[in-house]
UniProtKB/Swiss-Prot annotation:
GO molecular function: growth factor activity; heparin binding
Gene from which this protein is expressed: Fgf14
GO cellular component, one term: cytosol
Quaternary structure note: Interacts with SCN8A.
The entry's keywords: Growth factor, Nucleus
Stated name of the protein: Fibroblast growth factor 14
UniProt-annotated stretches for the region Disordered: 1-37, 216-247
Chain's role: Probably involved in nervous system development and function.
GO BP of this protein: adult locomotory behavior; chemical synaptic transmission; JNK cascade; neuromuscular process; positive regulation of sodium ion transport; regulation of postsynaptic membrane potential; regulation of synaptic plasticity; regulation of synaptic vesicle recycling
Highest taxon of source: Eukaryota
Length: 247
């Protein structure tokens, strides 16, 4: 009898132990499917946000990279001179093709439109409302030149901003027989003064220059100033109507 009672007690304890393990514990609660789904969606949002931020940063970095393909070149005028820019920004011609002052960046800023920048000075060649050439620290509409191939395979550079209003004749970059720069409205495209032969040295990548208003730039000292940089002039036949007096 005692053995039977012991066996019964042992059996009862075993059954109670098995029932205890089979019963879900209060501390071990099942997580609701909706909660899991919310956590999953939250993780996805975090992942997509990080991917988007990374993509934006990558695009910003790409925008900062140079994207314009231009050339470093010398510009040989048919008059027998190389165009050069002195350290103070003054322009003229020289027969010496070994000096760094004759190196220019030809940067495409539009369809057959270029900016001409001195390699050593970093200054842009610009033409003002009276046809004078001057150096500009900032890239403005006066720094844009249309690049056209003439019938003799020389290249001519004309101002994108100024021309004769009555005839529509363009104003050109040019050197005279003494190697001095000429007023744009005095240069004819059929004359050797306007004919340049680019002699590329290397292909280079450039960042697109930021366009500034003409009035923002200040001409370098000792160089013929641009009247239109001091005051915005209303153009009439290539001449400013209102001039700003200088002292």
């Amino acid at each position: 009898m005692a053995a039977a009672i012991a066996s019964g007690l042992i059996r009862q304890k075993r059954q109670a132990r098995e029932q205890h393990w089979d019963r879900p514990s209060a501390s071990r609660r099942r997580s609701s499917p909706s909660k899991n789904r919310g956590l999953f969606n939250g993780n996805l949002v975090d992942i997509f946000s990080k991917v988007r931020i990374f993509g934006l940063k990558k695009r910003r970095l790409r925008r900062q990279d140079p994207q314009l393909k231009g050339i470093v070149t010398r510009l040989y005028c048919r008059q027998g001179y190389y165009l050069q820019m002195h350290p103070d920004g003054a322009l003229d011609g020289t027969k010496d093709d070994s000096t760094n002052s004759t190196l220019f960046n030809l940067i495409p800023v539009g369809l057959r439109v270029v900016a001409i920048q001195g390699v050593k000075t970093g200054l842009y060649i610009a033409m003002n409302g009276e046809g004078y050439l001057y150096p500009s620290e900032l890239f403005t509409p006066e720094c844009k030149f249309k690049e056209s191939v003439f019938e003799n395979y020389y290249v001519i550079y004309s101002s994108m901003l100024y021309r004769q209003q009555e005839s529509g004749r363009a104003w050109f970059l040019g050197l005279n027989k003494e190697g001095q720069v000429m007023k744009g409205n005095r240069v004819k495209k059929t004359k050797p003064a306007a004919h340049f032969l680019p002699k590329p040295l290397e292909v280079a990548m450039y960042r697109e220059p930021s366009l500034h208003d003409v009035g923002e730039t200040v001409p370098k000292a000792g160089v013929t100033p641009s009247k239109s940089t001091s005051a915005s002039a209303i153009m009439n036949g290539g001449k400013p109507v209102n001039k700003c007096k200088t002292t």
